[in-house]
């Protein structure tokens, strides 16, 4: 109930909620630490310990990304510690991953794998773990301009890493020139998980189309209603039977968004909704059990699930705009044409600017072709897997991150 009331307050009085949840913590953070913080110079080699603060124990895309960063650095022999701040920042700790004990003050590197509002809240609560450390903010954003409320966080970081060029450009527009903004994509290992349709009640004779998203990341941005419309357009012209699976989380925190999705689905027998957290193993199994991933998102900072689907050898149909273009091309995915429209987000998370409206008819036509043509679908999946393996494999990204920590630069850095 408390989470639902909080969501209602954000919809009805976003400016007041911003003042309470972001501006007041920013003042507390400055009073406790910001006024005396000094930038920590880059060393020729990264100081130890290296701490990755993030939502390691939470069932969130941000948590998955933080866990991937830790695994990537550890694979290079780097001594790295995962500090789980999930419960400190209001998220349930559902996975026994990461250490909940705050690190001590003193030399080292702190990679804060959370966006500025959460970083400010964490520092306002307890600045000691950041004392004396080189702080790298790992941030992601889905629009062409970052919120003005992010600006106070720039004083607390010595460098910024981002998952895509799209996010890099958004942050560079707002960041002081002293701050390097480096593109360090999420590592995406090639999946070896075996499919098991019986585990989820999926028809073995159907082509399975998956659309998965967090309702807290807003229904407007993830745009599943357009995905549903495209699927209905596709199955009206296909010869093969197909099922659309919506895998969601966050329905309890975004009940109005969940209700809208349920209303749109209605009593359709070829659409399934799974609205519950899955273990990492179950989530990977669900992805392995599908044939096509469909994402008519209006914007993505990176699109981790899209990259994971490609790594699993799945055909992907996705809006051809924003962060996913870093690793998607016409031969490795279906890039759906779009028009840019003004942002309209009833959940109040995204305000101002423009984002993409995918061409639903074009998406439906492409989806129908993939449903009916096994050879076409499988060939695209193989090309996608090869491309992601070459560009986003853990050793590739781990080496890049290690270079950044050791003081080297890259072409995509400022």
Question: What residue spans do the PLM features occupy?
Answer:
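Conserved donor-binding/catalytic core segment of Leloir-type glycosyltransferases
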Residues: 51, 202-222, 228-232, 244-245
